[in-house]
């Protein structure tokens, strides 16, 4: 009998075992589509980013003009830039939904996969931050100044660390050059980490909406989930391309149409929408170091999710108390996002503080309590 090349070729069999013959639970819902959508986002961002890097100049006197030239004079440069800028937004929409799915269905109990995933989120946030600085508009410059300045809150070494990061005594040409280098490098780090993420996932296999072992009922990935992924691609690409073509600046900041000027500060310095929840948590604490620690904790708390799981059931499908808390957490994050976009004044200060407290209270205190109560209710 002839050898099946797909199953025996050293390279093809890796692809086969990951995308064709992979045993997959028969009941995973559309919430499991976001992994492949994130892969699509990453590929889109790397391709458009590479095309942009061919025309971009990482120099303070030329960066803004080079981006402007790209949009005016390069064939479809405006489209490539709009796809890249809005692609970041869709990347974050997908990753937040992906993480939300993981929390709801208890996927964090695959500890290695989850931990690599949190590292991926941190790397993505770093990539988006340094990328936002590159057009060298007002919000790019002041965003970079404010966020890098947070490192100065670290006791003893803070100030030295910030100056080392800047390559001088303020955000200037050396900062822009190194941020471009980081922005070019990190997506490939993300691609590498993604492979590690998938390697760990394929050790245990996917979770499913019921949170029960599915070894007795698996189906091949292709054609069932490959076609489902293609539908997901279409459903994401339609709003993505619509946004990039019809309203490309909807999610951007108008301040960034003004070239960076160290002598005038914008009235409201705020990051892109996908960082606003963390920015609100940062601002809700009056102390600088305290704010920085809260900011770090808002993401790093995800590492604790597997340790805080006390329920006998993996998924929240049959856990009404945890479900109420989960959706309260989602609403709380929306409130934080809104508060982060508002000026620091009454009533936004107190709303931000209450929402920040609620965020940590739900994850660290209320989720475990709900789990214990639900375990007791199982015995009734």
Swiss-Prot record:
It is a multi-pass membrane protein. Its cofactor is heme b. GO terms for biological process: mitochondrial electron transport, ubiquinol to cytochrome c. GO terms for cellular component: mitochondrial inner membrane; respiratory chain complex III. One of its GO terms (molecular function) is ubiquinol-cytochrome-c reductase activity. Keywords: Electron transport, Heme, Iron, Membrane, Metal-binding, Mitochondrion, Mitochondrion inner membrane, Respiratory chain, Transmembrane, Transmembrane helix, Transport, Ubiquinone. Its main location: mitochondrion. InterPro entries: Cyt_b/b6_C, Cyt_b/b6_C_sf, Cyt_b/b6_N, Cytb/b6-like_sf, Cytochrome_b, Cytochrome_b_C_euk/bac, Cytochrome_b_N_euk/bac, Di-haem_cyt_TM. Heme b b566 binds at residues 98, 197. Pfam families: Cytochrom_B_C, Cytochrome_B. Binds 2 heme b groups non-covalently. Heme b b562 binds at residues 84, 183. The chain crosses the membrane at residues 34-54, 78-99, 114-134, 179-199, 227-247, 289-309, 321-341, 348-368. A ubiquinone binds at residue 202. It is found in: Mitochondrion inner membrane. Belongs to the cytochrome b family. Component of the ubiquinol-cytochrome c reductase complex (complex III or cytochrome b-c1 complex) that is part of the mitochondrial respiratory chain. The b-c1 complex mediates electron transfer from ubiquinol to cytochrome c. Contributes to the generation of a proton gradient across the mitochondrial membrane that is then used for ATP synthesis. Heme 1 (or BL or b562) is low-potential and absorbs at about 562 nm, and heme 2 (or BH or b566) is high-potential and absorbs at about 566 nm. The cytochrome bc1 complex contains 11 subunits: 3 respiratory subunits (MT-CYB, CYC1 and UQCRFS1), 2 core proteins (UQCRC1 and UQCRC2) and 6 low-molecular weight proteins (UQCRH/QCR6, UQCRB/QCR7, UQCRQ/QCR8, UQCR10/QCR9, UQCR11/QCR10 and a cleavage product of UQCRFS1). This cytochrome bc1 complex then forms a dimer. This is Cytochrome b. It comes from Corvus coronoides (Australian raven). The lineage of its organism: Eukaryota, Metazoa, Chordata, Craniata, Vertebrata. The gene is MT-CYB.
């Amino acid at each position: 009998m002839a050898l099946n090349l797909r199953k025996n070729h050293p390279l093809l069999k890796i692809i086969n075992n990951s995308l064709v013959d992979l045993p997959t639970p028969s009941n995973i819902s559309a919430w499991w589509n976001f992994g492949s959508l994130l892969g699509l986002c990453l590929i889109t961002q790397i391709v458009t980013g590479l095309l942009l890097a061919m025309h971009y100049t990482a120099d303070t006197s030329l960066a803004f003009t080079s981006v402007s030239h790209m949009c005016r004079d390069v064939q479809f440069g405006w489209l490539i830039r709009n796809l890249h800028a809005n692609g970041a937004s869709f990347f974050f929409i997908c990753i937040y939904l992906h993480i939300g799915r993981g929390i709801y269905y208890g996927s964090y109990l695959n500890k290695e996969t989850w931990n690599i995933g949190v590292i991926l989120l941190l790397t993505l946030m770093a990539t988006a931050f340094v990328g936002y600085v590159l057009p060298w508009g007002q919000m790019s410059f002041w965003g970079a100044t404010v966020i890098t300045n947070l490192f100065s809150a670290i006791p003893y070494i803070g100030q030295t660390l910030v100056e080392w990061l800047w390559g001088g005594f303020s955000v200037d040409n050396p900062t822009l050059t190194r941020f471009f280098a980081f922005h070019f490098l990190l997506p490939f780090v993300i691609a590498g980490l993604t492979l590690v993420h998938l390697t760990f996932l394929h050790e245990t296999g996917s979770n499913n909406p019921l949170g029960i072992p599915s070894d007795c009922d698996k189906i091949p990935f292709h054609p069932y989930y490959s076609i489902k992924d293609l539908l997901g691609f279409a459903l994401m690409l339609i709003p993505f391309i619509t946004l990039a073509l019809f309203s490309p600046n909807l999610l951007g900041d108008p301040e960034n149409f003004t070239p960076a000027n160290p002598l005038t500060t914008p009235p409201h310095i705020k990051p892109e929408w996908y960082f606003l929840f963390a920015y609100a948590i940062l601002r809700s604490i009056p102390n600088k170091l305290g704010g920085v620690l809260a900011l770090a904790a808002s993401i790093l708390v995800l590492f604790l999710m597997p340790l805080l799981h006390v329920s006998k059931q993996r998924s929240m499908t049959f856990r009404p108390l945890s479900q109420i808390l989960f959706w309260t957490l989602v609403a709380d994050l929306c409130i934080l996002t809104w508060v982060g976009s508002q000026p620091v004044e009454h009533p936004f200060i107190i709303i931000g503080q209450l929402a920040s407290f609620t965020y940590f209270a739900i994850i660290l205190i209320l989720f475990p309590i709900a789990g214990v109560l639900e375990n007791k209710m199982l015995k009734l």
